Amino acid sequence: MTEKLVLVTGACGEIGQALVQGLAQKGGYRIVTADLSPLPNTITSVSAEHVQGDLVYQIKTFYDHDFDLIFHLAASLSSKAEVLSEDAHRINVEGTMQLLMLAAYRSEKYQKSVKFLFPSSIAVYGLESVEEK
């Protein structure tokens, strides 16, 4: 059985770490991780490669990979995004668009689909007012 090549962005977050560990335990995946932070010890051994830095500026790194799946978990959280809206737009919108373009490019080049999973939580809607925090 051939291993599927997987990219997990936001790999150092709570959900990202659990996903990386789950994929590793299941087997059959070669996992490439990406995050602003260095990998925690809990997942260092199961990541075939870690790309550290801002996703928008690291996107070219991923064009050399033939990903089967992309789990896009990287995001600027709502509380930070309210204060640093330009950074949030770069991370949440431009980063997502660049990954979608990567998936489309790879699909076209290799004539195979790249599964793109973009989960979210209720936090994307934000709170109605700052006082609710």
Regions found by a protein language model. Name each.
Residues 44-57:
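Rossmann-fold cofactor-recognition segment
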Residues 9, 34, 70-76, 116-122:
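SDR active-site strand-loop-helix element
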Residues 97-133:
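Conserved Rossmann-fold NAD(P)-dependent oxidoreductase catalytic core, especially the SDR/UDP-sugar
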Residues 6-26:
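N-terminal Rossmann NAD(P)H-binding glycine-rich loop of SDR-like oxidoreductase domains
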Residues 44, 80-87, 127-132:
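Conserved catalytic-core motifs of eukaryotic protein kinase domains, centered on the activation segment
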Residues 55-91:
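NAD(P)H-binding glycine-rich loop region in Rossmannoid oxidoreductase-like domains
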Residues 28-40:
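Conserved glycine-rich Rossmann-like NAD(P)H-binding loop of the short-chain dehydrogenase/reductase
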Residues 69, 95-98:
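Conserved cofactor-binding/catalytic machinery of classical short-chain dehydrogenase/reductase
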